[in-house]
């Protein structure tokens, strides 16, 4: 299943909009660099909402694993994810403020409490390669940058098209490739 992150994006968008408004007032009043009480309250409110969302998302994933007798949870990770990312003013405000590392650490903790094995899997090229066409899943290397070609393409946001024309959700394709890369279970039954 896919957990919808639109609520989290909305929280961040409202926080950034409100903070920009408060900052403009502060700048006009020449109050210096220290955050005002309203800015602190705005940040505290946003952090509480994000923390609540992450706790609920992690709990929902763990409850699903427990109710369906899933003993291993595989999570993709990327070491340089969001570091010095510059994807435009609007996208930076919505995307960079999402704490994926916080969700991963909460999942790791809850897995340990409930006896579920937690596996971190490197996820380079998992969203570009096609799961159904069994594309190669290379590991990204900064020292030796190669250009790879994949059989499928992402036709628009959230939709991935395989070589044979079949379409599937891009997040599902990426998740299946992360699972395939981890070699935790055999996926031959899916092909």
Question: What residue ranges belong to the model's regions?
Answer:
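Positively charged, helix-rich recognition surfaces that bind polyanionic ligands
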Residues: 1-191
